[in-house]
């Protein structure tokens, strides 16, 4: 438990997904015609005017107004939120599933912008950029050695489609003058399906990281591809999926459920009940199905999980889901900002609400509830649903299993959190960015060896340098005052597996990472066992 407390801040910085605040988008944006408008000035407006005209120091009334809105929303539910105009573009990119840019992943370390990955057939790939390139300038702006931020670089590299940006760079192995490369920006996909591959001759695996406007199309393409390869059983991984566009999760549920089965319904004080039912023949209505969930599975992911559990269509494996059963509708405000207001609750086919309890007077307890599961040991030992459960319901299939509302979705089969990476030294590898820097450096230095592997499975089976890589990491980590020499044996093994997965990610991105790390994942192993029975 002591190790848990040390590791928790890092865990939640990585695990909890920004998609949770996106909520559900039931309709298109609705423009606000009267928000905070009245024939007579409101008290809030009067106070802002008085501060602006008479306050002793200079202040930003825009900032005060934003804070006033945030204060107002803090007395509602935990998921009603105000999104300033400056943050809307990034949020819309997540929902749309693409953005305009040059198609690279980069990381700043040693005060240098390093190209970590280049999107195949993307703008940078076509312009000749390579992994290992180091940017000196973007346009006329020097970006090396001046403490520039990731956000600043991202803003320089993104821009309207077909517009051009010139980068000046140094290339590994070249000792002449820096290169200048001009790149035409293009549409860069943000895939919501991380990976889809055949585990064996009959079992396919698909992982969805969020629900964007392109998710169902991505999912359908993945399913049809795997079916052509012989898929008869499926493992669907929704771990760490914080939700997104509700309609996309409904479409995927329709691929698993037959007839006109109810998938979910929503209702609120000012929102009449709306039922969402199956409308078409699904892509995978008959094959055996297992879902993987954890405490990061939330919102639209819980809609899908709840529907499949209620109809006994899938076996749920993993840990209790987050417990977000509130529907947000975005209202576009006149300045380009957006109010995401909770307008309804969603209910699974049995009628249960998955929303966990909250107090309108403050959200601290609500925000810390998942962390409390770690401190209480629930994620290690499972739970009986007794301390968080609401009303009991019976599933709608022949087994008539008992399920509960009011606190997320409890899996049918529990698999605890793997604590083998919770030692203090390993935690520091993540917090300090040491692990990412090492992986990049090692990969760039050994590129010819990695190019001999045909794919992730070949790499996992044929890579024999784990000990060599671990020893190199041990020496590298000492530069950041991290000592791995006394790490417990079990933690060392887990770290070696993670190193292999991260190296695979350098070559094949998320497809490589999950295809390798799944082979060492207890929850995945359990899912494969159950789906094969």
Where do the protein language model's features map onto the residues?
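Residue-level recognition of conserved beta-strand edge/terminus positions
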Residues: 138-139, 170, 357, 406
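Surface-exposed patches in mature extracellular/periplasmic domains of secreted proteins
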Residues: 54-64, 80-85, 234, 264-266, ...
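Extended, small/polar residue-biased N-terminal targeting/export presequences
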Residues: 55-116, 162-195, 517-528, 533
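Cleft-lining beta-strand/loop regions that shape enzyme active-site pockets
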Residues: 25-40, 44, 48-56, 60-61, ...
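Short, small/acidic-rich helices and loops at N termini and domain boundaries
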Residues: 6, 49-52, 76
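Hydrophobic membrane-insertion alpha-helices, especially the h-region
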Residues: 8-25
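Polar, glycine-rich mid-to-C-terminal structural blocks
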Residues: 300, 312, 319, 323-391
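Conserved functional hotspot residues or short segments at active or partner-binding sites
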Residues: 353-354, 358-533
